Amino acid sequence: MSKITEEVETIITPILDELNFELVEVEYTKEGKDHFLRISIDKEGGVNLNDCTLASEKISEAMDENDPIPDMYYLDVASPGAERPIKKEKDYHNAIDKPVFVSLYAPIEGDKEWLGILKAVDDDTITMEVKEKAKTKQIEIPRNKIAKARHAVMI
C-alpha cells in the first residue's frame, strides 16, 4: 500500500463508518495523463448508486480539506462488484466455499494463477479445491506467496 492510499484510508474510514459502509479498497493510479482515486465500498446487502453518490460527496468534502494527493485526480466511488478483492482476514473467511482467483508471486506446482473453491483459511495458508483435467484436488497455498486474491465468477 502506498503512502497516499494509507493517508486516504485514514481520512475516509471514519466517514464511511459513520455512513455504515465498509471500505473494501483504495486505489490510486495514473492512466495516461490522468490520475484516478478509486474507492470501493460495500455494506450488508450491497451498495446502490445512491449509496455511492452519498459516499462520494462526503469523501470529496473531506479530501478538499485534507487532500494528501498533490495532483489533480478523478474520484470514483463504486461497489467492489462480483469479483471483489480479498485482502483482509474477514474477507478470506467470508470467501470460504466460494469461487476465488489467486495470483501468486512465485509458481506452486508450476502455476502462478489458481481458480477454485476456497475450502479453508488459517494464519499461514489457504486451501483451495481446484480442477486439474477431469480430477478435483486440494492445494495449499502459503499466504505470503499470494500477490492478489479476489472472488471469482465460475460458469
From Swiss-Prot:
Any one biological process term the GO annotation gives: ribosomal small subunit assembly
Keyword entries, A-Z: Cytoplasm, Ribosome biogenesis
InterPro entries: Ribosome_maturation_RimP, RimP_C, RimP_C_sf, RimP_N, RimP_N_sf
Compartment(s) where it occurs, according to its Swiss-Prot or TrEMBL record: Cytoplasm
GO cellular component: cytosol
One Pfam family in the UniProt entry: RimP_N
Record has Nucleus as a keyword: no
Family the UniProt entry places it in: Belongs to the RimP family.
Function recorded in the entry: Required for maturation of 30S ribosomal subunits.
PANTHER family xrefs: RIBOSOME MATURATION FACTOR RIMP
HAMAP family with a match to the protein in the record: RimP
Protein name: Ribosome maturation factor RimP
Lineage: Bacteria, Bacillati, Bacillota, Bacilli, Bacillales
